Amino acid sequence: MVAPPWDLPPDTSGIIPVIVHPSTGFGTGHHATTRLCLRALQIQPIQGRHVTDVGTGSAVLAITAAKLNAASVMAIENDLDAASAGRSNIAVNGVGAVMTFLVGNVRTVVTRPASCVLASLSGALLTNSARSIARCPEPGGILIVSGLTMQEESRVVHALEPIVWVDERLYEGNWVALVVKTRYRENLPHSTSRPGDVTSPFLEPF
């Protein structure tokens, strides 16, 4: 359950309460793309694993991963205002002990591959950044992407291949989330770089 503190029920047993202060639109948890990611995240074996949230915004997904007992969560955001909102939400949820918050870009993730990587971005950004984002999980790891529409789905899937394979697709209205799993390194082609991969703000130095 994602809500501001004044909307939480007195008894939160049986739910995962994520407190979010409504701010300047960096994610309140009520958009279909966030809901899809939350659905996908809660059925993954997160406990004891390392999670990275790329483009964390208000940190709803990162906080949820922490409350699902992830061993550690790295939240990455390249917008200073969004980063401020995310840090505030992490503090109010009391999950700072397992969190690392970095203001930067997706290149930061490469230094520490994660068991599960979350990327709720736009369809265009996912397409342009696919090869870099898909290499963030460790071999055999999980990548959950959202923010794409049904019209963008085939382009995003094509851009992610052959580094990952789609394990599950979730839909809400016109929005899509993909649960994809990374191939082991020995199953990858020698080179998967393409012209135009490094075209998004997430791939440029902050």
Regions found by a protein language model. Give the residues of each.
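Short, solvent-exposed coil/turn segments
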Residues: 13, 60, 173-175
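Structural motif
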Residues: 1, 17-18, 50, 72, ...
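Generic structural signal for well-ordered alpha-helical scaffold segments
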Residues: 7, 38-42, 134
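Non-catalytic substrate-recognition/targeting regions of SAM-dependent transferases
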Residues: 1-27
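S-adenosylmethionine
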Residues: 44, 78-206
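Conserved SAM/SAH cofactor-binding pocket of Class I
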Residues: 24, 28-106, 110
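Short, charged, solvent-exposed linker or helix-capping segments at domain edges/interfaces
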Residues: 11-15, 30, 188-194
